[in-house]
């Protein structure tokens, strides 16, 4: 009985240790904060391309390091970019599906920061041009990188 009580106590204590929160309560921030100073430097962000790209823009007080608040704002900005790019990609694909003469299943569409990239192989140069024109006409598209090839 005594052994069972000790074993149960150890399990409960270890579960409590596992339940400890990270220093800021944000696992993403804390995982990047290698030196555990409560800030993120540009070097600490180097492994996260999207966050590193946003470093200068979201360094609120321009001290060369991010607070948790800076990190959260940059993350929200990146999440909004992803949502906007996904919406554009969906709209372009939908336009291709509804347009006669466009082999939609032969065209890959990717969007990054409003730039749409078209890849794949279609039957003719006319289809290449038409697909590019359709993509360019979609709301939110800033640029079309048309890499479609004609057979």
What label would you give each PLM region?
Residues 2-12, 16-151:
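N-terminal targeting leaders
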